[in-house]
Every structure is written in structure tokens, then in C-alpha cells.
Amino acid sequence: MEDCIKRNQTKKIKVGDIFIGGDSPISVQSMTNTDTRDVKATIHQIKSLEEAGCDIVRLAILDNEAATAIGEIKKHVKIPLVADIHYDYRLAVECMKNGVDKIRLNPGNIGGNDRVRTVAGMAKERGIPIRIGVNSGSVEKRILEKFGGVTAEGMVESALAHVAMLENVDFNDIAISIKASSVPMTIAAYRLLSEKCLYPLHVGVTEAGTVYKGTIKSAVGIGCLLAEGIGDTIRVSLTGDPVEEIKVGKQILKSLDLLKEGIEIVSCPTCGRTQVNLIDIANSIEPLLEKLNKNIKVAIMGCAVNGPGEAKDADIGIAGGVNEVLLFKKGRIIRKIPQENVVEELIKEISEM
């Protein structure tokens, strides 16, 4: 299939063993919602994120105890860790001493140039990148006054001012995020930023909301930018289990053909032609397919109109009949299956592929 999306070429940086930017695959990030000082709970959550396919995880660093906990956490997990730092540059230093893979901070918020130079110097020495993260709710007062409130242009100016502070101390291992809770403002800000710099962009919609509404806002905002070639790593922000962020993030990438792994499920919305309980069948099959390590396309169709004809590009699928379904592969009908056996039989067929 022709690649319809041409990604912007950005500078490539390395976070642990993951590359961001350039021709690197778009990575999916999350953030723990445990107290980082609770090492056991934090490790448990990170392992759940690893299992879900998370590439990079960020942790809140509230104090020195949280910073030193990074060292113990690193011993038990595989994915790169990002320290989320606000105001106190000493916490960034302590995290780097304990092996963190990346720092998220805004240099304008940690004090004078000496402090910026200290953090940037240590990060450069250890090969640790820094992400500048501008959010609409934390734009500097002078910029708010200049632009008359929060604007995409103001957020970009803020981000580039922080970038300049790092560049002025000869640090260029930088990623940038520039998020708003407003989807249109987020899109406008990233579009503008992508025209002004070549640093890799961490894309997301901040404070997106609960799982349902946040998924929609994130899919629209992140999806729009990725479709334009903007974005090198993504984070879906949801009020809920961080594992859900990974599921949504990966599905956004799959929807744009930017991630080609795992089972892709296509299913019809059903209509009056459907003679089997396709909704229950689809809902029963989906979680079972998530456990199978296959790179295939599975079609779950309600009738012979939608499948196998319209779904003939699927590797395998079913099409509803009267109290039974047709099993097909690449558009070719294999056999009929009673409705009550369809889930078991389809999973068995897929497992053997």
C-alpha cells in the first residue's frame, strides 16, 4: 500500500534505547499516576505499561526522595524513564545521577543561567536529552500580556525562548511539546512550531479528559497532526488507567498506517440485513485477539454484502448468515460455522495462521 503520509524530517535524539525523530518509528509514551516514592507500586504500573506496548514512561519528581527512587525503579523495568521536573534544578541533577534517560523541564523555570548550564552540562555529558514542555495553562505572564491571553503564537514563542536558553549553553539534544486542552489551538501551535524548528516534536492534547471524551479529543488532535506529517512521539492524556493511554495511542497510529503490528480488526456497524448477534460476537472476539501476536487483518461482517466481498483484503473474517456465519480467507469462503461456535472457531483459525 502506498504511504499516504509524508513525515516531517526532524533531528533524531536517543532516549535510552529508543530513538525519537528522523526516520524513527513514532513512539507511544505515558506517565505513571503512582507516587514515584512508592517504588513497588510504580514498578508494578510501569510493568503493566510495558506489557501494553509503552515505549517511554514519565514519572513525577516531587522531591529528592522521588529522584533517588529512580535508581531502584530502573533496576526492575526495561523501558526508558523520563523525569518530570518543575522549578528545582537539583531534582534534575539527582535524577541524572540515578540513571534517568530523559529530563522534562522548562529551563526558564529553574532559575538563572548557572542552573541551566549545570543541568544542560550534566545532561550532555551523560547523553540525556531534555524535553521542553509548554502547556497552555503555564505560559509566562509576559507572553500572555504580549498576545492578550493564551494563543498558539504565544505558546510557540514561549517554547522557542526555552529552546534558546539551552542552545545558548551549547545543548541541542532537545525535544519539544506544546500542548493545550483546546484541540484547534494545539493543532495550530504544532503547525507553527514545525515550521520554525527541526527538533523532534512530542505531540498530545493536554488535560484531554476522561477515557471516552479524552480518547476522542486525542484522536482528533494527534491524528490531525500525524496525518500532516507532524509528530515524532505521542502521549494520549486520559483521566484513567495509563494503560488505556497506550491502547488509544497505538490505535491512532494504526488508523493512520503509521504502526503495522498486531491484529487489525474491521467490523461493520450492522443493519437490518444482519441475522446474527454481530455486536456480541465482535465484543467477545476483540479482547481475545489482543492477546495473539499476529500481524493480520480480521474482518467481522454482518452479512454477505459487506463480507467477504467488501472485506476481501482481510486475511481472515466472518460474514453473518441466518443463525450461522461464513468463514472466509482473502475473500474465499472456507466453511460455515454455527453462530454459537463462531468465537471459538475464529480464534482457533487465527491461532493456527
Curated annotation (Swiss-Prot):
How many cofactors are bound and how?
Binds 1 [4Fe-4S] cluster.
Q: Which UniProt keywords apply?
A: 4Fe-4S, Iron, Iron-sulfur, Isoprene biosynthesis, Metal-binding, Oxidoreductase
Tell me which EC number(s) this protein carries: 1.17.7.3
Q: What are the required cofactors?
A: [4Fe-4S] cluster
**InterPro entries from the xrefs?**
Dihydropteroate_synth-like_sf (IPR011005), IspG_bac (IPR016425), IspG_bac-typ (IPR004588), NO2/SO3_Rdtase_4Fe4S_sf (IPR045854)
In which pathway is this protein known to take part?
Isoprenoid biosynthesis; isopentenyl diphosphate biosynthesis via DXP pathway; isopentenyl diphosphate from 1-deoxy-D-xylulose 5-phosphate: step 5/6
Q: What HAMAP family does this protein's entry cite?
A: IspG
Its family remark reads: Belongs to the IspG family.
Role noted for this protein: Converts 2C-methyl-D-erythritol 2,4-cyclodiphosphate (ME-2,4cPP) into 1-hydroxy-2-methyl-2-(E)-butenyl 4-diphosphate.
PANTHER family in alphabetical order: 4-HYDROXY-3-METHYLBUT-2-EN-1-YL DIPHOSPHATE SYNTHASE (PTHR30454), 4-HYDROXY-3-METHYLBUT-2-EN-1-YL DIPHOSPHATE SYNTHASE (FERREDOXIN), CHLOROPLASTIC (PTHR30454:SF0)
Q: What is this protein called?
A: 4-hydroxy-3-methylbut-2-en-1-yl diphosphate synthase (flavodoxin)
Gene (name only): ispG
